[in-house]
């Protein structure tokens, strides 16, 4: 069964500076005019929707991204096709660039970043995905971070089509009013967020993870290296999801990997706990790799990890 994924599809350009930014940024910064020498540069494929889709696909799922690319989007389309990921929900706009993030780091790990949403702001213009001449009917959807308008539009479409969706709060919490957050939550089957995002959500809406669970919604709350917790409808408390022990290299993209594994399990008809455990394994495999997308992952490998942690896998 297919899973609809909305959110960002982006390119990252990462520069490294061998010195320290602070040495060139001292003094009056109101008239800043300086240049940093980059000793290395690389370009990565990134974006929440893309990361989630690739994690799902490697496990054998059927992700369908609904979103926008720009005039430079052909490389991303080719990448999706190379993995067998459907591109029927993607459209390239010739007058804008694909969403881009330019990141500059120094020897101390300090970071300067610029994000340009580009084509992401045109996502609302992309028609609903079609397959074999008919509107796609996914089993479920996830609304991952991709801009306020994109998220609100996707929620309306999913509700009107009777498609249950998971609200993935992400780092766009401050884009929404309390009323908008409550509306997005009330129409979803559940919410996914990190500890930091959960605290921000509660501060804006007054709704804790426990309170949301008591309303009948599923809550997936991630704790970084400490794993995750599930708050299930009708349950008395949180169900812990232990992390798989790995040597961490780069945590960037781990949350997306977690969601990809979680959605794969739900789409397969597994219960939320088993699905979250799959997500935890996928997240661990991502953390053990320097890349947000290019990390070793197979369903057989996930099954072995699952059995080693929790016993019979059942998938």
How would you describe each model-predicted region?
Residues 1-64, 75, 247-248, 315:
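Glycine-rich phosphate/adenosyl-contacting loop at the front of the ribokinase-like
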Residues 3, 62-63, 87, 165, ...:
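Hydrophobic anchor at the start of a short beta-strand
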Residues 9, 146, 257:
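Active-site metal-binding loops of divalent metal-dependent hydrolases
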Residues 57, 159, 267:
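Gly/Ala-rich phosphate-binding loop of Rossmann-like dinucleotide-binding domains
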Residues 62-89:
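A glycine-rich beta-to-alpha transition motif near the start of alpha/beta enzyme domains, typified by
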Residues 88-93, 101-145:
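Conserved phosphate-binding/catalytic loop of the ribokinase/pfkB sugar-kinase fold
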């Amino acid at each position: 069964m297919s899973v609809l994924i909305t959110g960002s599809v982006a390119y990252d350009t990462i520069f490294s500076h061998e010195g320290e930014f602070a040495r060139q940024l001292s003094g009056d910064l109101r008239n800043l005019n300086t240049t940093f020498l980059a000793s290395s540069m690389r370009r990565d494929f990134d974006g929440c929707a893309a990361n989630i889709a690739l994690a799902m696909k490697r496990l054998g799922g059927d992700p369908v991204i609904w979103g926008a690319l720009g005039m430079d989007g052909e490389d991303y389309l080719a990448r999706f096709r190379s993995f067998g990921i459907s591109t029927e929900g993607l459209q390239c706009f010739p007058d804008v660039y694909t969403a881009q993030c330019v990141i500059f780091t120094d020897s101390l790990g300090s970071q300067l970043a610029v994000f340009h949403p580009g084509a992401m702001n045109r996502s609302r213009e992309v028609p609903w995905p079609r397959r074999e001449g008919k509107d796609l009917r996914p089993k479920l959807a996830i609304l991952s971070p991709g801009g306020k308008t994109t998220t609100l539009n996707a929620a309306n479409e999913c509700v009107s089509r009777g498609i249950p969706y998971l609200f993935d709060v992400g780092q766009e919490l401050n884009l929404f009013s309390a009323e908008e957050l409550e509306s997005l939550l009330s129409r979803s089957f559940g919410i996914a967020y990190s500890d930091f995002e959960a605290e921000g959500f509660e501060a804006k809406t007054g709704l804790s993870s426990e309170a949301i669970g008591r309303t009948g919604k599923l809550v997936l709350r991630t704790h970084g290296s400490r794993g995750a917790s599930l708050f299930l409808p009708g349950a008395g408390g949180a169900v812990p999801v232990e992390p798989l022990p790995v040597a961490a290299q780069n945590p960037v993209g781990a949350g997306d990997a977690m969601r990809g594994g979680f959605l794969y399990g739900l789409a397969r008809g597994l219960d939320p706990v088993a699905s979250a455990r799959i997500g935890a394994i996928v997240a661990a495999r991502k953390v053990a790799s320097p890349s947000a997308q290019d990390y070793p992952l197979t369903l057989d490998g996930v099954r072995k990890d699952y059995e080693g942690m929790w016993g019979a896998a059942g998938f």
